[in-house]
């Protein structure tokens, strides 16, 4: 073998590692694409799971969205017999309803027991037909149809149950203050008769600014 053949053979031997490194790079590209696809699927899953009126989420305290404030309504359910129901539409103060076209982004409901509370209640916010009289039969049907996600609040010896709040996102619906009368807070007293002095419900409605506070309450 002459020198030219020897040099050619040497060059061929030197190319093999480069072919190997290109193969490793190709493998890394494939892994990166797989990882990117997995992240994309995860993002879609998370986006689909963000809270809506039908899929609420537990919250603590959150800052209002920029340009938004909130109005609070306090509800004290009257005595509710064991296995019975209570419903109350969301009627905001006149000072707020005069701005009926202001958008509503979220509704937060907070359940706070009074000292005598030692039972279990189911609580939800639900859009109800204008024709509904919120009778026991009507509310019972709403709880039974499976379309009403609920906060199950149980007696906690230490005081307030850790998860005592639900946040409903109304942004996709473009709901406004004028629409709030179409929504109601519903309560089901599951195990015992609920006395009128046992429970307080705070409903915080986050809407476009009619300036007051900037933080949803704890």
Swiss-Prot record:
Biased composition (Basic residues): 11-21
UniProt comment concerning the protein's domains: The N-terminal arginine-rich stretch does not seem to be the major RNA-binding region that allows formation of an infectious ribonucleoprotein complex.
Location (main, coarse): virion
Subcellular location: Virion
Family to which the UniProt record says this protein belongs: Belongs to the cucumovirus capsid protein family.
Annotated organism of origin: Cucumber mosaic virus (strain M48) (CMV)
Keyword Ligase applies: no
Compositionally skewed regions (Low complexity) per UniProt: 1-10
Record key words, sorted: Acetylation, Capsid protein, Ribonucleoprotein, RNA-binding, T=3 icosahedral capsid protein, Viral nucleoprotein, Virion
Taxonomy of the source species: Viruses, Riboviria, Orthornavirae, Kitrinoviricota, Alsuviricetes
InterPro entries for the chain: Cucumovirus_coat, Cucumovirus_coat_Asu_sf
Region described as Disordered: spans on this chain: 1-28
Residues with N-acetylmethionine modification: 1
GO molecular function terms listed in the Swiss-Prot or TrEMBL record: RNA binding; structural molecule activity
Statement: the UniProt record of this protein carries the keyword RNA-binding: yes
GO CC annotation, single: ribonucleoprotein complex
Matches recorded under SUPFAM superfamilies: Positive stranded ssRNA viruses
Name listed for the protein in its UniProt record: Capsid protein
Protein's job: Capsid protein. Probably binds RNA and plays a role in packaging.
Pfam families reported in the protein's UniProt record: Cucumo_coat (PF00760)
Residues in coiled coil: none
């Amino acid at each position: 073998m002459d020198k030219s053949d020897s040099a050619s053979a040497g060059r061929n031997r030197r190319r093999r590692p480069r072919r190997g490194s290109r193969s490793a790079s190709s493998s890394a590209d494939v892994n990166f694409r797989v990882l990117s696809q997995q992240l994309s699927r995860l993002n879609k899953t998370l986006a689909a799971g963000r809270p809506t009126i039908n899929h609420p989420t537990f919250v603590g305290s959150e800052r209002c969205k920029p340009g938004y404030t909130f109005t609070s309504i306090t509800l004290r359910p009257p005595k509710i017999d064991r296995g019975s129901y209570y419903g109350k539409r969301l009627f905001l103060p006149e000072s707020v309803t005069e701005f009926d076209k202001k958008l509503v982004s979220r509704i937060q409901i907070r359940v706070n027991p009074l000292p005598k509370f030692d039972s279990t209640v189911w609580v939800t916010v639900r859009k109800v037909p204008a024709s509904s009289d919120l009778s026991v039969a009507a509310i019972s049907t709403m709880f039974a149809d499976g379309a009403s996600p609920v906060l199950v609040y149980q007696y906690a010896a230490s005081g307030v149950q850790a998860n005592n709040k639900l946040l409903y996102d109304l942004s996709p619906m473009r709901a406004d203050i004028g629409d709030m009368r179409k929504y109601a807070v519903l309560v089901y007293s599951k195990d015992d008769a609920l006395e009128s002095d046992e429970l307080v419900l705070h409903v915080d409605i986050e809407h476009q600014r009619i300036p007051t506070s900037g933080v949803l309450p704890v």
